[in-house]
């Protein structure tokens, strides 16, 4: 059995990790930690776990005494909060999957520019592995620290990677228009997340300065060995969970829709969790699953390729992708514990 600990277990992503790891046939949950609910039973925070998870959440001081009992620790904390425990865990030889943005950007100056805090573990950035399994499976197998991708970044990179790697589009023409459910804002109390503030409305935010922008650019640039700059605009929509990314770029090769679909199908032919659909995609078809559904189209009038990509932000955009990474890291079938169809209603 893989012995795991979860730090930050009572946030939306943390509780999703608990759900997935509880039903995983190869996992034993050794401890759950929470900054806000230390000393409380996990199922008193989330009543749906009564009878299933009886664990009491522990504080960080106690975590340090329990780390020796685990093989891997999941960090489900906001950015800037995981540095101490990542360093502590790595020094003990424990594998780490970090779900914050703290180790995604390889350039510490870029991190400091976008996240507005100094990076105290610059040396660790050299060997952190970007945990997007469909694209970096070989690196993940050898990792000691996996930085789980952001939700917007996951949907966008998966949608655009074939276009970049196959050199099908003008690199400077990429636009990503993305929508997220409200759970993407986290569980902490924020005015903009209150029901009356976010229901029956839509709004753009982070225009020109969203932190997933450099993450998307960095990973796409790896495929063409040149710096890609793109336009990324996220929006908040009144649904609980889900990401819908619509990606646009100018074609530089003479392709029709059928040829483009075939190129995508071949690119992802060995990736179980990627579905290239003939139909237009919808968020509800991937809800509560680890799947990424995408649809490709060409606007012949403007010579634009349009790729629509949908994921569940708490699953493929966070927790289930982290479990997929763990499976790869420990050499088990990456579908283990994740072969779950969407619950569309």
Curated annotation (Swiss-Prot):
Its EC number is 1.2.1.38. One of its GO terms (molecular function) is N-acetyl-gamma-glutamyl-phosphate reductase activity. One of its GO terms (biological process) is L-arginine biosynthetic process. This is N-acetyl-gamma-glutamyl-phosphate reductase. Gene3D superfamilies: Dihydrodipicolinate Reductase, domain 2, NAD(P)-binding Rossmann-like Domain. SUPFAM superfamilies: Glyceraldehyde-3-phosphate dehydrogenase-like, C-terminal domain (SSF55347), NAD(P)-binding Rossmann-fold domains (SSF51735). It catalyses: N-acetyl-L-glutamate 5-semialdehyde + phosphate + NADP(+) = N-acetyl-L-glutamyl 5-phosphate + NADPH + H(+). Its main location: cytoplasm. It is an enzyme of class 1 (oxidoreductase). The lineage of its organism: Bacteria, Bacillati, Bacillota, Clostridia, Eubacteriales. InterPro entries: AGPR_type-1, NAD(P)-bd_dom_sf, NAGSA_dehydrogenase, Semialdehyde_DH_NAD-bd. Keywords: Amino-acid biosynthesis, Arginine biosynthesis, Cytoplasm, NADP, Oxidoreductase.
């Amino acid at each position: 059995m893989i012995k795991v600990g979860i730090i930050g277990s009572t946030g939306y992503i943390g509780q999703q990790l608990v759900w997935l790891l509880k039903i995983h046939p190869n996992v034993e949950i050794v401890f759950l930690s929470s900054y806000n609910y230390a000393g409380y039973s996990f199922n008193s925070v989330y009543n749906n776990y009564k009878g299933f998870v009886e664990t009491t959440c522990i504080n960080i001081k106690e975590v340090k005494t329990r780390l020796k009992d685990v093989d891997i620790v999941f960090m489900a904390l906001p950015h800037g909060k995981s540095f101490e425990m990542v360093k502590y865990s790595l020094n003990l030889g424990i594998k780490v999957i970090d779900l914050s943005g703290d180790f995604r950007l390889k350039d510490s100056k870029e991190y400091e520019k976008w996240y507005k805090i100094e990076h105290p573990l610059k040396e660790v950035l050299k060997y952190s592995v970007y945990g997007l399994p469909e694209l970096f499976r070989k690196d993940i197998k050898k990792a000691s620290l996996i930085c789980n991708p952001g939700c917007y970044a996951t949907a966008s990179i998966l949608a655009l990677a074939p276009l970049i790697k196959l050199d099908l589009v003008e690199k400077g023409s990429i636009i990503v228009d993305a929508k997220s459910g409200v759970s993407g804002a986290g569980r902490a109390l924020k005015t903009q997340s209150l029901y009356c503030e976010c229901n029956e409305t839509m709004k753009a935010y982070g225009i020109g300065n969203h932190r997933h922008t450099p993450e998307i650019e960095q990973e796409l640039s790896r495929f063409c060995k040149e710096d890609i700059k793109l336009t990324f605009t996220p929006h908040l929509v009144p649904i609980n969970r889900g990401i819908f990314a619509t990606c646009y770029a100018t074609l530089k090769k003479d392709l029709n829709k059928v040829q483009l679909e075939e190129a995508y199908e071949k690119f992802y032919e060995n990736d179980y969790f990627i579905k290239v659909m003939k139909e237009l995609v919808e968020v509800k078809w991937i809800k509560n699953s680890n799947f990424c559904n995408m649809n490709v189209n060409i606007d012949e009038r403007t010579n634009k390729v349009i790729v629509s990509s949908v994921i569940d932000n708490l699953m493929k955009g966070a927790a289930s992708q982290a479990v997929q990474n763990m499976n790869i890291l420990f050499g088990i079938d990456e579908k283990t514990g994740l072969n779950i169809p969407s619950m569309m209603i």
